[in-house]
A protein has these predicted regions:
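N-terminal leader/linker segments that initiate helical-solenoid repeat arrays
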Residues: 10-51, 57-65
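Sequence context surrounding c-type heme c attachment/ligation sites in exported
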Residues: 14, 18-21, 25, 179-200, ...
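"A position-specific structural signal for the A-helix of alpha-solenoid helical repeats
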Residues: 22, 62, 69, 103, ...
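Short coil/turn linking the two alpha-helices of tandem helical-hairpin repeats
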Residues: 24, 28-36, 64, 69-75, ...
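Flexible helix-coil transition and linker loops at the boundaries of alpha-helical arrays
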Residues: 47-60, 88-100, 128-140, 171-184, ...
Length: 270
């Protein structure tokens, strides 16, 4: 009888955990679309889910990404450290997740602050390992791409990236025919980032062609997505026509909003 009650209790807890995890993830998707005020609620729900079932890997992945987003967007070191811990726990439970390994490696390079060489090398090795294990994984390549932009050229080989622009082009080719209501601007953003990479390499002619390709991607149909696309197009067009600021200097391009932007009016002041 006691065993039966325990089984029923654990089953109910697991069900509640998944419900809270989904509630948190739904809120987090709204955050990525631009409604940043929902971020505390998203994290709260996912933390509640973790307290009920700390081994539910899908929730850990989304919670870690939410902390990563908070740390990168609002420059919160505590959130970066929280993200690292959650990704580390997730990898203990499922070592096969190279997407989590790439995120964890990137976080270690950030946390090293350019001073802790041992931590940086550990992060670089994790990024390189994730890439070697799953070279076709888009998430791994995207994390590698954004990490490489924050590293000096001589350090990029340490994470397995000798050709940052080539890596971005690979992702761009994957996303050219990609359609998603969740990430409606993926192709636009990747072509713009390729353009920025070419600008950094000094190839202004090819950079302009990549920016033009981004602007030619068909417009979305949803009103919110149209509003988001308008913001992205304006930034890209300004850069293409001689603007001095890299696209990454703009908040919507500096973190995770760009591919998902559908509520630009709800972005919090910077």
């Amino acid at each position: 009888m006691v065993t039966l009650i325990l089984i029923l209790f654990l089953t109910a807890a697991a069900s509640d955990a998944k419900e809270l995890a989904q509630k948190g993830y739904t809120a987090f998707k709204e955050v990525l679309a631009g409604d940043e005020a929902q971020l505390p609620d998203a994290i709260h729900y996912m933390e509640q889910a973790r307290s009920l079932d700390e081994k539910y890997v899908p929730n850990l992945y989304n919670l870690a990404r939410a902390y990563f987003f908070e740390g990168a967007t609002f420059n919160k070191l505590e959130s970066i450290m929280n993200a690292e811990k959650v990704f580390a726990r997730m990898l203990e439970l499922d070592p096969s997740r190279t997407d989590a390994l790439a995120f964890h490696g990137s976080l270690l390079t950030i946390m090293s602050g350019g001073k802790d060489m041992a931590m940086f090398m550990r992060g670089a090795e994790e990024l390189k390992t994730a890439f070697q294990r799953t070279p076709d994984d888009a998430t791994v390549r995207i994390v590698l791409g954004f990490t490489s932009f924050n590293l000096p050229p001589q350090a990029r080989a340490m994470i397995g990236i000798n050709d940052p622009v080539g890596n971005l082009k690979y992702i761009g080719n994957r996303l050219d025919n990609f359609e998603s209501d969740f990430a409606p601007h993926a192709s636009v953003v990747m072509n713009a980032i390729i353009g920025e990479g070419l600008m950094a390499a000094g190839d202004k002619e090819k950079a302009r062609a990549s920016f033009e390709k981004a602007l030619k991607v068909p417009q979305p149909l949803d009103d919110g997505q149209i509003a988001g696309r308008k913001v992205l197009d304006e930034i890209i067009r300004t850069r293409m026509n001689g603007g001095s600021k890299p696209i990454f200097a703009e908040p919507v391009f500096s973190t995770c909003h760009s591919c998902h932007l559908a509520a630009p009016d709800k972005l919090l002041p910077r």
